[in-house]
Amino acid sequence: MKWKYTDYRPEGFECWSAKWKEDYELTVYQIGENRYSIGWYHKGCRVIKDYIDANSWDEAKTLAIARVKNYFHQMATYWDNMELGFIKWTREE
């Protein structure tokens, strides 16, 4: 099974990913009806793995960003001036 990028963004897909400054990536996976797993990676190594409850993908992405900001207070000023463009990943069998 492979993952591929698409920029089509309907609700209910399994993984969204956003890159920041080439070395960082934030992922949001839906693992249940209102349950999401988030990962924060630096150069491909996971720094944070956490779980959040949200009612929609938009809320999950907002909460994921807030969670990362909470872990890295020193990065908050960078995050406030950054736009994350989330990209949906879909599975290919």
Where are the language model's segments positioned?
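Short aromatic-glycine-(Arg/Gly/Cys) micro-motifs in beta-strand/loop hairpins
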Residues: L26-I48
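Negatively charged, low-complexity tracts enriched in Asp/Glu with abundant Ser/Thr
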Residues: M1-K21, T77, N81-T90
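Mixed-charge, Lys/Arg-enriched low-complexity segments
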Residues: H42-E93
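Alpha-helical interaction segments
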Residues: K4-P10, L26, Q30-G32, K61-T62, ...
